[in-house]
Amino acid sequence: MNWRNLDECAAYARLQAIRAPSLKTVLCGPEGIERVRRYCTDAGAGLRYHYAAKTVNEEILTALAALADEQELVAKYDALRAGAQINTGEKRKVLHHLTRLGVQGSSLASLPCEVRDMHAFYTKEYERVCAFARQVHEGGLRTSRGAPFTDVVQIGIGGSDLGPRALYLALEGWAQRHQAVKMRTHFISNVDPDDAALVLSKLPLETTLFILVSKSGTTLETLSNELFVAHVLRQAGLEPHTQFVAVTSETSPLANNPQYLASFYMDDFIGGRYSSSSVCGAVVLTLAFGPQVFGHFLSGAAEADRAAQEQDIRRNAALLDALIGVYERTILGYEHTAVLPYSQALARFPAHLQQLDMESNGKSVNRFGIPITYKTGPVIFGEPGTNGQHSFYQHLHQGTSVVPLQFIAFQHSQLGQDPIIRGSTGQQKLLANVVAQIVAFARGKEHADANKTFSGERPSSLLYAKALTPQTLGALLAHFENKIMFQGFAWNLNSFDQEGVQLGKTLAQHILAGEVEGVLRAYADLFDLAHAPTC
């Protein structure tokens, strides 16, 4: 495989020379109906990717296919899955796909022995998680006072919180409808003491199980919250070691610690933001909904992973989505992307994608540490529809910057409690707004009053399925993970480290240790941090 910068590719120069089509012409003109029918492809597990409202045409799609070939995007994806050392900065493999590979013999047989061993390790840990969850649900594991556990709290931050929390919220309604709710579930992430205090104030402390998630075992915020919770439990006359579970690595200070009821392990080959399908997400979600639900989620993710191996970009939704995103960011210069799920269940999904995308591809040097001159990962933001329509859509429609949009929608609601009101159901109203927004952003509107004129030409895509189920959620998560990795390959980035996270953390440690001077001291003095207690 060859690793080269994007601007060294012949297809890149070709894309720069092609004039982008007008959406008013290609989508809203006489060929629009046929375009809507054709510009769509499967993404796995019933999920579909629709790109008719993107500013691409046959010429651009051909050039994007050439770029995919020139940058060997699928070959690099296959190499990653086979255990190549893709994380160059930290000299590590990238193996989160193995956590949802299951026991597919044909898939495993082609993998190197070392990778098969890692798959066996991940599978063993997942089986331990399932056994532990069944023990809790069936009453085999109880509190120190003999009561069954009723609630579970995940304590973690970053990838140990954003992904698992987003997935839990996404499945909560589905689980209620299908009577799959096993335990009430909560999350603590911020080191802000009000976060933990507020969550704990609403809990039956005696019957709550706490999951501490830190791969390194040294995460400041997570360890601080653990001690906060332990303090509150002791004040209530409870013993913390009878109510804590750890999720960490086998080399962390938390490993094999008798102060935890159980410990479950991951490794350095699974990055935090890619860890939702590992034990990082499995423990809390299996306790919340049971092993079968999480198993269906994994199967949906595995199906999307297999779809991402397709060479033809028009049959590979993640690859096509990635290439169009590279075209919009680097060729057209669009700086942002809005993720707009028309499902309240996905309320926190944009926040997870924000970390997944911006921490992966928010880089200004290539995978060899050499500065690059072209634009890379966009700023990601989003909010569920129709809430966002009453918030920031004004800017999206009439602002001076074009923001590509990624809509997500489902034909049916999760709970099914949807009476006809004023001639239509709530779900019909929701979906009518999705359709209206796609066309409105593309077509715009002319008016004699400039203040009421909409320029249109605002590109969007649509990911949709019949319903948000565990399988479609797994495919949705894997689609974005694979999309972001493909983009990193195209830009020649290392999408699996996060050096930008470290600088501020290091300075904060100096401040708390009183090792400050100059402007750092001046800002610290605003909060009287020089006189903060140290123990």
Swiss-Prot record:
Protein name per Swiss-Prot or TrEMBL: Glucose-6-phosphate isomerase
Alphabetical UniProt keywords: Cytoplasm, Gluconeogenesis, Glycolysis, Isomerase
Localization terms from the record: Cytoplasm
Pfam families: PGI (PF00342)
One GO cellular component, as annotated: cytosol
Residue ranges that the Swiss-Prot or TrEMBL entry lists as coiled coil: none
SUPFAM superfamilies in the record: SIS domain
Gene label: pgi
UniProt keyword annotation of Nuclease present: no
Family: Belongs to the GPI family.
Enzyme class: isomerase
Catalyzed reactions per annotation: alpha-D-glucose 6-phosphate = beta-D-fructose 6-phosphate
Enzyme nomenclature, EC number: 5.3.1.9
Function: Catalyzes the reversible isomerization of glucose-6-phosphate to fructose-6-phosphate.
Keyword DNA damage set for record: no
One Gene Ontology biological process: glycolytic process
GO MF terms, alphabetically ordered: carbohydrate derivative binding; glucose-6-phosphate isomerase activity; monosaccharide binding
Database matches in InterPro entries: G6P_Isomerase (IPR001672), G6P_Isomerase_C (IPR023096), Phosphoglucose_isomerase_CS (IPR018189), SIS_dom_sf (IPR046348), SIS_PGI_1 (IPR035476), SIS_PGI_2 (IPR035482)
Top-level taxon in the UniProt lineage: Bacteria
Pathway: Carbohydrate biosynthesis; gluconeogenesis; Carbohydrate degradation; glycolysis; D-glyceraldehyde 3-phosphate and glycerone phosphate from D-glucose: step 2/4
Active-site residues per Swiss-Prot or TrEMBL entry: 359 (proton donor), 390, 505
Main localization, broad class: cytoplasm
PROSITE patterns hit by this protein: P_GLUCOSE_ISOMERASE_2, P_GLUCOSE_ISOMERASE_3
